[in-house]
């Protein structure tokens, strides 16, 4: 035992979750520790044989206001906050007849669990803990002499230190204090996230907008971000083997992709999560139509809509079978045996879907033992995106393809004849599909399926060339660009990019427009008799 160790002679215990408390109870009994406790915690400890002093006996005041006030009393908080290395603090406690605590054990009201349960506002507010965080923060501040425990996983450690009489060293108490402050910070951040959503700024409160700034939705873009995530899994490694990585979960959301149920295969990797999330979001861009996406390195190898999920997969895979090797497959409809049979011979890292037919699942589980099989119960709901930059954070609303220009009825015809119904269908498909393609992006589509994708190039000409090349060199001699539709995620700065598509036989193009050379681009389409629409909406994706 070092000179900074303080034996645990007196403990304050107040926990909402009682699981594991019997470990502490046994240690308290063996060591003869004096225990002060509240309400249901005191009752449970007494049932376990611990001699317990109720908080109300210490304070001389009963719990009141339906339990809202229990421990908020100087007889409790002075015992927590007194630094017993300070003689003046010790003498003041003696003067007021207050005994110090060596250990405080607290876990808080389950606010996040209450929110996730769908409880109404009144019930949710009642699960905002006041006394608990006050005790935790007080004990953490006074780590000079008090050990604070907020994590039930530490109960066994505490029990061993109680029984052997060592207590904790100063460094250990400081480490526990850091955990405690992280716990209360996360708790408050979760409450803040809920209040920001449910208690927005009323119209009666006017706040001036600084010159040069844009008015902002305070619910989505508050002055200070205090969101919190809880570590759920330590991953084998990050994007590369020399990088560390973990998966964190939003405590207020238990239905998102990060909470996917894994039904088979190896553990998910960092790259698996990135690609599968991209694929999952891509297929839901087409709901309620049945869609399948094949994604690799966060870019689609193929996307398609089909009358059945098996047909959609077949069409998506046909876009680029070579790149699909080692990719991720997502479907927005239940995976059938027919689709599972077509997936079986293809090396695939992950498949994600809302559900699986029993025979399809059995086939995938038994014939593709390494395939990670994910089931996600709900479509994506993320409406805000975050990207960390050095020293800061960029926040934006999610591109949900819901801008005015995403409605084909709002598109402006700038060249050629109005497209027929089948071509319009392919243009709409291409326009929605290009949202998930890394910029600069050109996408060629036919029969509501991608046939050529040019992605991630630093100029639009290269993207156009790549889309045509992929469409035709991967087509076993067939000309998949002739009579197809194409989309560009941003305007053509010059006519050359559009001319590549036109010369390849594309008959209709949709693009945002907005270039200072728009007329040159439009004229190139007019000369070729190609239909061109402009949307006024851009879909960059970086």
Identify the role of each PLM range.
Residues 347-374, 380, 494, 499-542:
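C-terminal binding/interaction regions
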Residues 301-322, 443, 449-498:
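Glycine- and Gly-Pro-enriched alpha-helical subdomains that act as flexible
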Residues 1-58:
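N-terminal glycine-/serine-/threonine-rich phosphate-binding loop
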